[in-house]
Each structure stands twice: as C-alpha cells, then as structure tokens.
C-alpha cells in the first residue's frame, strides 16, 4: 500500500529546481522502495518571471508564500530559499500551522535553530535539517535511530564542505 504525501516548497532557484528534477526522476523508485508517493504541488517563489527547469512548469507557482503555508492539502513544506531573515519567519509560520519543515539551510539552523526546534516541539511537528549537515551525508538519523543502544559521546572532525574550503 502506498501512502501519499503532498509537498509544498519555498524557493525554486538552482537548488530548488534540482530538487524538482530529482523528485520527478526518482518519484516512482521512492514510492516502490518506501511505499510513499511524494507529490509536489505548490511552490512559493520571489520572482514569478524567473526562468526555471521545465519540470517546475506543472506546479502552481505563487509569489505569496502564505498560499503554500495555508494550503490544507500540503503535508510538508520543503524550504530551499537560501535566505535567513525572511525564511526564519516563514519557517516559524509553517511550523505554527501544523506542518513539518525540511530545510537544507545551514545558516537558518545555526542562527535560529533553538527557536525553530522549540516551535516544532510546541506544534507537534518535525523540523528536519539533515541536508544542512555534513554536505548532506545522512548522519543524523543513523545517530538517532540506528545507534540508539550506543552512547555516542562525541564526533570529531571537520564536518562540512564550507569549513573545509575556508580552512584550505
């Protein structure tokens, strides 16, 4: 049995367009493997006139992010806007609306993480940010779920590409 999850997205620049392309290419495989059919239906953008990937064309684009947040059909909002100041408020509003948020925004988590996680807990939803860590390598979920019987006391190393670049 397949469960359908409807996604909304905030931001559709280079990374957002790639996300749409990969989702379209891998949607059937994801459904076959996980039993979850991911449908992206609405995308909030800053500039409706900007050129985007052809795959984006079948979605409803809006320059009013409230239309994404307030859409009752949307289960999860993917934040790929890349900004921090305006995005913080958007993510807070989304969490307050009872929707989980997935973000790859390192700066957002670094600057507003405690506030956002508190709001997610209060609203009973998830704020997922694994794409913002260790160059997107899935490490947080294995630490939290696969090693639940182990006591991980520390992780040492340079854990992101940005730091590697700055230090080299």
Predicted features along the sequence, with ranges:
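Charged, alpha-helix-enriched surfaces in structured cytosolic catalytic cores
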Residues: 14, 134, 138, 150, ...
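Glycine-rich beta-alpha junction loops
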Residues: 44-49, 133-135, 158-164
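Rossmann-fold NAD(P)-binding glycine/threonine-rich loop
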Residues: 81-97, 104-145
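Conserved anion/nucleotide-ligand pocket segment
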Residues: 145-168
């Amino acid at each position: 049995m397949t469960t359908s999850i409807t996604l909304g997205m905030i931001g559709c620049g280079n990374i957002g367009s790639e996300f749409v392309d990969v989702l379209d290419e891998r949607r059937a495989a994801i459904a076959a493997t996980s039993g979850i059919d991911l449908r992206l239906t609405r995308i909030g953008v800053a500039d409706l006139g900007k050129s985007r990937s052809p795959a984006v064309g079948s979605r409803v684009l809006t320059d009013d992010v409230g239309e994404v947040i307030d859409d009752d059909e949307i289960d999860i909002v993917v934040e790929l806007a890349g900004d921090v100041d305006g995005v913080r408020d958007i993510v807070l509003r989304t969490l307050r609306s009872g929707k989980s948020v997935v973000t790859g925004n390192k700066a957002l988590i670094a600057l507003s993480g405690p506030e956002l996680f508190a709001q997610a807990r209060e609203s009973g939803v998830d704020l997922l940010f694994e794409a913002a860590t260790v160059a997107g390598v899935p490490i947080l979920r294995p630490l939290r779920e696969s090693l639940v019987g182990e006591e991980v006391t520390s992780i040492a190393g340079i854990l992101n590409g940005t730091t590697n670049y700055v230090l080299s």
